[in-house]
Curated annotation (Swiss-Prot):
It is an enzyme of class 2 (transferase). PANTHER family: METHIONYL-TRNA FORMYLTRANSFERASE (PTHR11138), METHIONYL-TRNA FORMYLTRANSFERASE, MITOCHONDRIAL (PTHR11138:SF5). Belongs to the Fmt family. NCBIfam families: fmt. The gene is fmt. This is Methionyl-tRNA formyltransferase. The lineage of its organism: Bacteria, Pseudomonadati, Pseudomonadota, Gammaproteobacteria, Pseudomonadales. (6S)-5,6,7,8-tetrahydrofolate binds at S113, L114, L115, P116. GO terms for cellular component: cytosol. Keywords: Protein biosynthesis, Transferase. GO terms for molecular function: methionyl-tRNA formyltransferase activity. PROSITE patterns: GART. It catalyses: L-methionyl-tRNA(fMet) + (6R)-10-formyltetrahydrofolate = N-formyl-L-methionyl-tRNA(fMet) + (6S)-5,6,7,8-tetrahydrofolate + H(+). Its EC number is 2.1.2.9.
Length: 314
């Protein structure tokens, strides 16, 4: 068994917490956790700790929440921990070079894409949105550039026609931790050699924007169907009907044509809407103040609200 390493873990969301769980169950010692400051959340806007902080507190691990790692005080605090390795997963702060150089074995990152494709903040959703046939996790040695470091290990998984941003996230959150543990063992043994990324093959996964979730029915149906899956469970695609907001939780390709946004048909199978190319059948919707429902349930009680000829998005 490889030597036990003194590890500092840096991460924030649930995806990162799954990696921390695996490290806590390993032979390695997690000596400290870095995570984003508590943020207001929910209707009451109470300050809420990140999933990573909650897990660290449960296990009695010291938690650090600097607003930045660019100041000398935060850097000195990290150096005093004398870590062998820093494992970074969806942390959300830039690590300056002095921080990258602090651990004996440097810093490694678990990134939810097959690099160099989809560098950046939202690789899972962008892969679904683009219609990619596979995704995965890349463990890389970190350097100053954004997701540009040498690749230590890759694991892949197919993306199905039913995958959502949420389902792919959950699958990668299971694959990533095992890849990180394998990479750590290789680093500790000195047997792992990084592979340089081909920058010419790189593209960028921009952060999700709520404005992108508004359905533009002038676009092709195939693009909108992928967008709806990619943006589920957040931020959820939406449109309007008769002035009311309408969240779209699921859809499939339909048949027919017409002016974009026009309802072509409504029945127990779904609400078929004309797009710039083709048509989209909306199968799971949420009305204001309601919960997500299969369209067949809405149709039974609100048939007149979804009459063919009405236009969505006006």
């Amino acid at each position: 068994m490889p030597d036990s390493l003194r590890i500092v873990f840096a991460g924030t969301p649930e995806f990162a917490a799954e990696h921390l769980k695996a490290l806590l169950a390993s032979q390695h010692e997690v000596i400290a956790v870095y995570t984003q400051p508590d943020r207001p959340a929910g209707r009451g806007q109470k300050l809420m700790p990140s999933p990573v902080k909650q897990l660290a507190v449960e296990h009695g691990i010291p938690v650090h929440q600097p607003a930045s790692l660019r100041n000398e005080e935060a850097q000195a605090e990290l150096a005093a921990l004398k870590p062998d390795l820093m494992v970074v997963v969806a942390y959300g702060l830039i690590l300056p070079q002095v921080v990258l150089d602090t651990p004996r074995l440097g810093c490694i990152n678990s990134h939810a894409s097959l690099l160099p494709r989809w560098r950046g903040a939202a690789p899972i959703q962008r892969a679904v949105q683009a219609g990619d046939l596979e995704s995965g996790v890349t463990v890389m040695q970190m350097e100053a550039g954004l997701d540009t470091g040498p690749m230590l290990l890759k694991v892949s998984t197919p993306i199905s026609a039913e995958d959502t941003g949420g389902s792919l996230h959950d699958r990668l959150a299971r694959l990533g931790p095992q890849a990180v543990l394998q990479a750590i063992d290789g680093l500790a043994a000195g047997t792992l050699i990084g592979e340089l990324q081909d920058d010419a093959q790189a593209n960028y996964a921009h952060k999700l924007n709520k404005d992108e979730a508004r359905l533009d029915f002038s676009r092709p149906a195939v693009e909108l169907e992928r967008l709806i899956r990619a943006f589920h469970p957040w931020p959820i695609c939406h449109t309007t009907l008769n002035g009311d907001a309408l969240k779209v939780h699921a859809a499939e390709l339909g048949e027919g044509s017409g002016a974009p946004g026009t309802i072509l048909a409504a029945d127990k199978n779904g609400l078929t809407v004309a797009c710039g190319e083709g048509a989209l059948r909306l199968t799971r919707l949420q009305l204001p103040g309601g919960k997500p429902l299969a369209f067949s349930d809405l149709y039974n009680s609100r048939r007149e609200q979804f009459a063919p000829g009405l236009v969505l998005g006006q």
